[in-house]
């Protein structure tokens, strides 16, 4: 599992060693990286993702024994566990997570605890189908896979940040939890979202970037095929226009940049929600090479 610390400062002029990271976030604390990740604060964090909730609890002891035998000292837990932590909207179940964190910690294996937002429970999709992203044809992406949610959905963000705060309140001071794992494999299934939420957010993003519609028209070359716009309210996202049509390359490039920014903003929102409660532990995440 490869991790990184966000917002590290390349030209840090302080006397701190190079692996010490600072952040502009007032709720963050400086920390040494990656020493704090391990249980004893020494050595290299060695391990991977661990999904104990996908197995019968009676095999956990054997899991831990084999981890120790392999030299594992850190595992990421609960990446896909939102439905186990919050099986219903008004019901929370931390019992199983308490037990596995305690079992790992007592064995000297540190926990990089996930925000568990990589995939949402089905009850959330059933109640709020509008949180699903849409493909370029206007079809909602079906629930049941990773990242089946729109990063621009205010409804989804509200539920996700509530989960983050609940986890931080319960485990922020737990000595066995040495880091936070935000999201998972960003951009895997929702980097390109063509929903109305995304459209509205893209218009605001374009206005912030270009300032005037004249600047945007010039950058996108919108005189071609009569695409000139009179205001940012006319900006479109590159939805499907027909098999023989081509998307404006400037529009497409900015939509790619916009998608990246929306995922980064979502990461920061989760991070900050936890940092308000637990400011003294590092934050990590991971990526798929293809995204």
What are these regions (language model features)?
Residues 2-10, 16-76, 87, 102-106, ...:
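N-terminal carbohydrate-binding accessory modules
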Residues 41-45, 77-81, 147, 248-252:
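A short alpha-helix capping/helix-coil boundary motif
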Residues 50-51, 86-88, 151, 257-258:
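Short, contiguous strand/loop micro-motifs
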Residues 51-53, 78-81, 114-123, 178-187, ...:
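Short, solvent-exposed turn/loop segments enriched in Gly/Ser/Thr/Pro and often Arg
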Residues 61-68, 73-141, 164-168, 270-277:
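Aromatic-lined substrate-binding rim segments of carbohydrate-active enzymes
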Residues 138-291:
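Polysaccharide-binding and catalytic clefts of secreted carbohydrate-active enzymes
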């Amino acid at each position: 599992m490869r991790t990184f610390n966000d917002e590290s400062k390349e030209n840090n002029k302080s006397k701190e060693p190079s692996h010490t990271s600072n952040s502009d976030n007032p709720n963050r604390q400086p920390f040494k990286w990656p020493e704090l990740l391990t249980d004893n604060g020494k050595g290299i964090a060695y391990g991977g993702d661990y999904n104990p909730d996908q197995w019968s609890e009676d095999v956990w002891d054997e899991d831990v024994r084999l981890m120790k035998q392999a030299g594992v000292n850190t595992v990421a837990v609960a990446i896909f566990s939102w439905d186990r932590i919050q099986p219903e909207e008004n019901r929370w179940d931390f019992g199983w997570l308490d037990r596995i964190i305690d079992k790992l910690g007592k064995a000297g294996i540190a926990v990089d605890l996930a925000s568990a937002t990589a995939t949402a429970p089905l009850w959330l999709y059933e109640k709020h189908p509008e949180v699903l992203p849409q493909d370029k044809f206007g079809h909602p992406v079906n629930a049941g896979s990773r990242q089946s949610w729109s990063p621009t959905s205010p409804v989804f963000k509200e539920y996700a940040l509530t989960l983050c705060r609940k986890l931080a309140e319960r485990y922020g001071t737990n000595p066995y939890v040495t880091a936070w794992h935000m999201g998972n494999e960003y951009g895997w299934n929702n980097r390109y979202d063509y929903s109305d939420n995304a459209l509205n957010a893209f218009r605001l993003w374009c206005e912030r970037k270009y300032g005037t519609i004249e600047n945007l028209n010039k950058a996108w070359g919108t005189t071609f095929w009569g695409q000139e716009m009179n205001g940012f309210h006319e900006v479109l996202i590159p939805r499907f226009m027909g098999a023989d049509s081509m998307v404006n390359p400037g529009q497409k490039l900015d939509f790619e940049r916009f998608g990246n920014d929306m995922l980064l903003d979502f990461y920061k929102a989760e991070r900050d929600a936890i940092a308000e409660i637990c400011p003294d532990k590092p934050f990590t995440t991971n990526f798929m090479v293809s995204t």
